[in-house]
Design a protein with these regions (language model features):
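ATP-binding N-terminal substructure of ATP-dependent carboxylate-amine bond-forming enzymes
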Residues: 1-110, 114-115, 341, 352-377
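Active-site nucleotide/adenylate-binding loops and adjacent lid/helix of ATP-dependent enzymes
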Residues: 107-181, 186-192, 199, 212-235, ...
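A short beta-strand motif that forms the metal-chelation/ATP-contact edge
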Residues: 142-144, 185, 255-266
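Glycine-rich phosphate/pyrophosphate-binding beta-alpha loops
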Residues: 148-151, 263-275, 333, 338
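ATP-dependent carboxylate/phosphate-activation module, predominantly the ATP-grasp catalytic core
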Residues: 177-240, 263-286, 294-300
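Short acidic-glycine loop/turn motifs at beta-strand connectors
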Residues: 187-192, 252-256, 311-312, 352-354
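A short glycine-rich, hydrophobically flanked beta-strand micro-motif that places a catalytic Asp/Glu
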Residues: 242-254, 294
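Peripheral (often C-terminal) accessory segments that flank ATP-dependent C-N-forming ligase machineries
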Residues: 281-378
Length: 378
């Protein structure tokens, strides 16, 4: 059995997808939840769960251990969430084990706001106004970090006073009204195939106005909108040499779209299309430059997942852990005794239905009942 390493802030989705395709899995992440460990032969911790930050030393130590260990050789590693901010770490890791994904230099370039939005402008692809220097009137502007992830880096520019951009990854972007959306696609360094378009669940968390909390898809859009999104995906894949599963984030306001960024690694939205062949497709796209002719969803129903964040500090009791483990709609299940500060991710929920609105309602109802159970003293 070929062995594959998967890494990220959370490696659960990648670990389950790799196991589904018949790989032995070594998972590297911050949480080590029950689902991840069930799908993996080994688990390595690569950072403190509450920090949501990947520790470079731990990642490289884990990869080095995999190089040295006896038994089946690890064929490579797939970086997931959290690595879009770490091109230097991708380079260092690739020197130890083959990196099966977008190369470090391409990640660096696609996350450079000047180069990224320059490519969009050169191809007349719509996006919200951006600038490197602070606007004279910050009202209606966001301050973003091109190396950030999950929306935790986004702030209202007006709330931080006379902000100055301290490094090249920070930039200002005009807030655009509408629905937060994404396109899930796979690229081979030159061409790309669009898998589906999704709605994103985005919520304010304290001073952070746009924190990622989940996704719903595939959702139906007009043929014209799908064409424009597909054109943007193909232009960016070729311009930056993207490889493997990626996603394009954009805003939709009626018939208008505004491209926001590319996540140059397997996105959370890939879980909406859970089926055999996703990791096989990743390897073929990255190692052989082959794209699948098409990958229809295993179901025509709409799926959704949502991250459940702690509303206050809590410790997961054995009874609470048992409750989570017994629910088929709960994933990324933590172990009993796990402690969470306010704003920490606890687990995730899934639902499916005929429409995005139905799925959204099911997720919301499940979140309310779940939090009531976890916050009620046992």
């Amino acid at each position: 059995m070929p062995v594959l390493a998967v890494a990220g802030v959370s490696a659960c989705m990648l670990a389950e997808a790799a196991a589904r395709d018949g790989y032995g899995v070594v998972a590297l992440d911050l949480f080590g939840d029950a689902d991840t460990r069930r799908a993996s032969q080994q688990w390595h911790v690569i950072g403190a769960a509450g920090s949501l930050q990947i520790d470079e030393v731990r990642v490289l130590d884990a990869l080095q251990q995999l190089v040295r260990q006896s038994g089946d050789a690890v064929i490579g590693w797939i970086p997931g969430s959290g690595f879009e901010a770490r091109p230097e770490l991708l380079e260092a890791g690739a020197r130890l084990l083959p990196l099966i994904g977008t190369p470090a230099d391409a990640v660096r370039r696609v996350r450079d706001p000047v180069e990224f939005f320059g490519v969009l402008d050169a191809h007349d692809i719509a996006h919200p106004s951006v600038r490197i220097d602070a606007p004279a009137d910050a009202e209606g502007w966001l301050l973003k970090d091109a190396r950030g992830t999950g929306g935790w880096h986004i702030r209202h520019a007006a709330s931080i006073g006379d902000a100055s951009v301290a490094n090249a990854s920070l930039y200002f972007q005009r807030a655009m009204p509408g629905m937060s959306m994404s396109a899930t696609f796979i690229a081979n360094g030159e061409h790309a195939m669009l898998l589906g378009i999704n709605e994103l669940i985005v919520r304010p968390m304290g001073a952070r106005p746009h924190v990622y909390a989940g996704c719903i898809g595939p959702v139906a859009v007009t043929a014209d909108l799908a064409r424009r999104v597909g054109d943007a995906v193909r232009v960016l894949s070729a311009a930056f040499g993207l490889r493997g599963w990626c996603s394009l984030d954009f805003m939709r306001d009626g018939d208008s779209i505004g491209v926001l960024e590319v996540n140059p690694r397997p996105p959370a939205s890939l879980s909406l299309y859970a089926q055999h062949g996703l990791i096989d497709a990743q390897l073929r796209a990255c190692l052989q430059a082959e794209l699948p002719p098409s990958m229809p969803s295993a179901s025509q129903r709409v799926s959704g997942n949502e991250i459940v964040y702690a509303r206050r500090a809590l410790t997961l009791t054995p009874l609470g852990a048992q409750h989570l483990a017994g629910r088929a709609d709960v994933h990324d299940v933590p172990v009993a005794g796990a402690r969470f500060a306010a704003g920490d991710p606890i687990c995730s929920l899934s639902a499916s239905g005929d429409t995005a609105e139905q799925v959204k309602a099911l997720l919301g109802a499940a979140r309310v009942t779940l939090m009531h159970t976890l916050e009620t003293p046992s």
